[in-house]
Amino acid sequence: MIDVMQIQEILPHRYPFLLVDKITELKVKEVVLGYKNISISDHVFMGHFPGHPIYPGVLILEGMAQTGGVLAFESMEDKVDPKSKVVYFTGIDGAKFRNPVRPGDRLDYEMSVVKNRGNMWIFKGQAFVDGNLVAEAELKAMIVDK
């Protein structure tokens, strides 16, 4: 497992935009599982939507991308200092939002490698709440020097 403090050693994101709390499983160049606990105290709920809080789909996608970023960094053959690199989210295909995500939910991410060539990555991403699919997409990313 990789906890949030270790995630911050890998990714440059910080509160309020670090959207993965823990990595629970990681198989190099294959798959990563992680999650974010959705809390009513998340700033996004001040405006999305007052009286009817729904976690934004775009943030679900960003959390998926960050989870995939951890997998990409941990899968690099030449172990480099992640502080000298950054993962850029370069594309998205087939994004679908199936069910709303609400405060109190645990948002589980599953990112599987579709293709990796050098610093380029394509992931199949899925997000779940209580085992139910809430979002899916194919995400593309690349690792570059800062």
From Swiss-Prot:
What EC number(s) does its UniProt record assign?
4.2.1.59
One of this protein's GO BP terms?
A: fatty acid biosynthetic process
The UniProt catalytic activity note for this protein reads: a (3R)-hydroxyacyl-[ACP] = a (2E)-enoyl-[ACP] + H2O
Query: Which Gene Ontology cellular component annotation is one that this UniProt entry carries?
Result: membrane
Primary location:
cytoplasm
A Pfam family matched in the record: FabA
> What InterPro entries does this protein map onto?
FabA_FabZ, FabZ, HotDog_dom_sf
Cited Gene3D superfamilies? Hotdog Thioesterase
The answer to whether the entry has keyword ATP-binding is: no
| Keyword tRNA processing part of the UniProt annotation | no
Q: Where is the active site?
A: 48
Q: Which UniProt keywords apply?
A: Cytoplasm, Lipid A biosynthesis, Lipid biosynthesis, Lipid metabolism, Lyase
Q: Which CDD domains does this chain map to?
A: FabZ
Q: What class of enzyme is it?
A: lyase
List the subcellular locations. Cytoplasm
SUPFAM superfamilies linked: Thioesterase/thiol ester dehydrase-isomerase
- One function term, GO molecular function aspect: (3R)-hydroxyacyl-[acyl-carrier-protein] dehydratase activity
Q: Which family does it belong to?
A: Belongs to the thioester dehydratase family. FabZ subfamily.
Q: What does this protein do?
A: Involved in unsaturated fatty acids biosynthesis. Catalyzes the dehydration of short chain beta-hydroxyacyl-ACPs and long chain saturated and unsaturated beta-hydroxyacyl-ACPs.
Which named protein is this? 3-hydroxyacyl-[acyl-carrier-protein] dehydratase FabZ
What gene is this protein a product of? fabZ
